[in-house]
Amino acid sequence: MIPDTATQLYQRVEALADLDSDAVEVRNRSLHAALAQVCHEGVKDTGMAFGNLFSQVDYLCRSRAVGAADRQEIQTMRRHSNSTEPIADADWPYDLRALALLVSAVTSTDVPSTLVGRLPVMGRPADLSHTIDRRYLRCVVTDHDDQFIHVHADGDGTGDTYTVDYTAHSYLQPLLKRGMQLNLIDCHEGKHLEPGLIIVEPDYLLDISQIARCFTDYGHHPLAYVANRLSPAANSYAILLGNFAGRALDDIINHPTDYDWLDTLRTNFRERALDYCTCPDFAGGATFKVDAKAQVDNLCGIVDNLFAPDPASRRRPYRRDRAILEPSFVCERLGIQGRIDLMTTDMRLLVEQKSGRNYNIERGYANQYGSFQKEDHYVQLLLYAGLLRQNFGLGRRKTDIRLLYSKYPLPGGLVAVNEYQTLFREAIALRNRIVAQDYAIAHDGFGSIIDQLTPETINERQLSTRFFSDYILPQLQRLLTPLHTMSAVEHAYFCTMATFVMREQLAAKVGSNEGVSASMADLWNMPLATKREMGNIYTGLTITGKEKSKGRGGWDIVSLDVPDQGEDFLPNFRPGDSIYLYAYTDTPNPTGAILFKGSIVAMSQHSITVHLNDGQQNEHILADSTYAVEHSGSDNTFTANLRSLSELIHAPSDRRQLLLSQREPTADTSRRLTRPYSPTYDDTLLKVKQANDFFLLVGPPGTGKTSMALRFMVEEALYDPDASLLLTSYTNRAVDEICAMLTEAGIDYLRIGNEYTCDPRFRDQLLDRRVGETPRLDLVRQTLLSARVVVATTTTLQSRTPLFTLRRFSLAIIDEASQILEPSLMGLLTHIDKFVMVGDYKQLPAVVQQPAALSQTTDPLLTAIHLTDCRNSLFERLYRREMALGRT
């Protein structure tokens, strides 16, 4: 910075020091103006967008390596300049000293001698009353009143009872229950514990992105979280563009000299061909290319800026070779988990990318936080930063956090933000309210909240803008109104099944019987010795090979050597299992590691091969180290089941009545088979053809029902030139058997799914293989529309619901149907004209974690339709009804 500028800024400090002692009323205003000028000079050439002085001061102090004590002094000065209260005489000289220190840091010059003698040599005396005595304490609530929580410490080695003053967290009062677990974070210990943060049921991890999604212009009510989970799976032009931009960021960072954006476009389209073809507002390939290229151009400039040295800064540049994309983290301390868009492995940089519109940037209007980021994006970034701080013991100033808006070029496209603690605490409070709500639903039933699940409740701020009234409100009404117009049996069914799903989710997250049922919380609660004894962890792994499954993509196939795991080790893993892969030094600790999420491809006694969900293009990331593999968890299945139940309630009345046994299935006995197939099966095949709504085929395993009866049903159905068939089952093994039958019969089919859970013999039938290396939208759509037989697991179909917006199937055949729980099928069956279930009601039902007493129901409305236990399949319920009516 030129000397003249430094001189001018110091002269402003001198002018402030020359103010008359009685000019108290102008101190704040004058100090604020001088501070604004200093900050402007410091950030004007950074190429980044800043909002209020808080974020500017924060950035300048960190980039100029200002010490922690001086940084605190400068921020105190900033707060004083913003205050409506006149700056006190005792504070004034210290504030001027802080301003001079900031000028010195920004201009890289020494404070002139003309000022040295007029300013304090040291900062203001520290307030010693605010030291933190306990960083973390896990405890259990024994009692509480309006001011204090009485807790029993768990795991601090003392077993002591503490009294916690929670007056700063009064919103917790209606949430607290005896026996509830809490994490107390950053406690000040005096007469009582005063925690900085209180985390309710911390083993129940919530996804950060889902918490952030609840922050809207109309409020952030915890019931918005429930509404979001009931909403149809989103597939839009903006989402597709965002997925492309995320892939482009990865490619740009890792191919600085030979990047070709068309490679990214082709790869992204091939991987998401189904989403592109079923997107309802896709504007066409030409328009998408223009928008995608604009995102790429902006990203190239932003990435260059992000990793370039800053001549005006003492900050070391961020290292491109330490950049990592899409790493996962679990944080038991805060009860959250998430996947970060971009960070460096030294934790110095954290970036969240957004590709959509930001009206604050477009209009140049700062938000209520004095900056340009959207609130939900801000919440997401703050929670990620808090997660890193808790997991890795980072200081608050260790990590620089940025929001990358790839729709906009610099400076608007890269927003430096500060760690605004008020909003962070608000986000944690919402997390606590959501968790308490989920526990209440699991305990009291979904019916306990359904009356409050309305647009009026979710619109906390009673917003009535035109945008809300014309766009948001109709969406909420379409989603929620059917919940309040259900018939009595529909209401009983929906609430009972939704409660069942929520209880399964609770068991999957925290366990229903410690030491017996598996749960996500085993990652940090289960001792290492127990993990080994139960076969729930591989340790001491070393990488023996890395492969790229997709050309210029990342290394996503990782082979690891498995050393001796102990004499009695029996792995509780199998191919297809979802896992975390992470490095460690001494003891495996998933909460203190960067996690790579993936699935097991192959395993033997001495080796294991995993496929990473997000391949790493940076060769330095998966380096020589010692690795562990553990089971990972996800809310996807439970969210899909809730969404499936919602689809049922939104289905046409005739369909709801059929699936809930409120109308009889019909048949057309005039239909005849087109040809004889086998004396053993012809009578059954004729009944299948004559059925209009559904047919149940009962047969024990090994009777040839899949290889013969299913084949004949498919062949007969395909005689109708307008027929379209969907063949499905719960397991990939069963779907592989279906594919084998179709292949042997010479029947063409299309398989939807993941190649690493598909038998290699049938991978050529996968959609991304069929569309080739240079896919075209029209050809992909034609492939989907012309495929008369589509094969997939029920889990895959639940995650690919946009398929049903493109086409409707005339017949679905569901194999091993007695192993599939009702919530997993109901949504699927609303998109099918007719279905055939093949199964055996005598087989054991699907594995359920909650106690049998909780899954049973005695509601007469449900027992009347033969629903007595939610752990039984739809196949069994319908079979029992047909038996009772004598129709078998």
Can you say where each PLM-predicted feature lies in the sequence?
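Amphipathic alpha-helical interface elements
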Residues: M1-P112
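A helicase ATPase "motif cassette" and its flanking acidic/Ser/Thr-rich regulatory loops
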Residues: R118-V151, G242-G246, E419-P575
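Conserved ASCE P-loop ATPase motor domains encompassing nucleic-acid-directed helicases/translocases
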Residues: L137, H144-L172, L182-L184, A508-L658
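Mg2+/Mn2+-dependent nuclease catalytic core
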Residues: A153-K177, Y318-N432
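Pre-ATPase regulatory/linker segments immediately N-terminal to the P-loop/RecA-like helicase/translocase core
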Residues: A212, H221-A224, P409-L410, N418-Q437, ...
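A non-catalytic, helix-rich entry segment at domain boundaries
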Residues: A248-L325
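Walker A/P-loop NTP-binding motif
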Residues: T706-D720, E737, M741
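Conserved helicase motor core of SF1/SF2 NTP-dependent helicases
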Residues: Y719-A723, S729-T731, E744-G746, R781, ...
